[in-house]
Amino acid sequence: MKNLPVYKHPASYAREHNELAAYRASNQANAACKEAIEAAIRDHYRDNRLDAAAVDQVVQQFGYDRTFHVLAITVCQADWDRRYSPDNRAWANAMSIPANSDAWGTDRNCYLAVNNHPGLVDLFLSQTRKAYAQEQQKTSVRDKLKKLPETTSPKISAKSKSPER
């Protein structure tokens, strides 16, 4: 499911553009990611501490893009809840998750919100964002190393044709 792209449009858009198959596949992967996040938090929360392995467990299976999408939906669905840090709330609102209303006016995104304690979800989100930033930094260092100019041997100057001592 890591290679399946996240469909970021509502069902109405998918219906109008004949993309319902992509929407449904992405929505199923989002629901599976939500369940994986809940299981990871449940399995890795011990002694008032959330192990960083929880993030690795989810990201290896779903990738950062889908994990961030589900976490942004979770925070945006509870924008009234101050147990999410202001930084994470601002990040989630910047993700611009569109409303996905059904025929009765219910936002379908509510079914994709993680159902763990908001403090633990906030901690999981912070750890995920930190892991992503570290991975991006590693990637940029690798790119810099690849782009280093090749060193060339120094050229002998035309003026220094005197014999060496």
Placement of each model-derived feature along the sequence:
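Gram-negative host-targeted secretion-system effectors, predominantly Type III and Type IV
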Residues: 1-164
